[in-house]
Amino acid sequence: MTDRASILQQIADALRSVEELTGVFDEQAPADQPSPSAVLGAVQELPGRLISDTERKLFVTLHLWSEYQGKVELLRLADAVEQALPFNFCFDDFQLLKDEASGWEHLAMTLRVYCTKG
């Protein structure tokens, strides 16, 4: 287990190690950012598994974006991201969508990890 800031840094570092990604952002990517890219999204914190209440469960949403027309590129990137993450990060779910405004493909992936309270 580790603290919240370290968890987000580990995720960002793992994303940066995925060679296919052209950028990793904490907020929205710039409008001229080449595809594919990643954005760190929402973070939700819930009670952990321990009776002592010294643990927290974090859910972190990652957003992968691609202008490639089709789902294959994002599915491959999701696999690469999972492989790059430390072993204690658990894949929870993902949803693959098409952003109608931009025409880009969008994969929202939720990760689960445990950290120490406070």
Regions found by a protein language model. Give the residues of each.
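Charged, amphipathic alpha-helical segments and their flanking helix caps
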Residues: M1-Q28, A42-G118
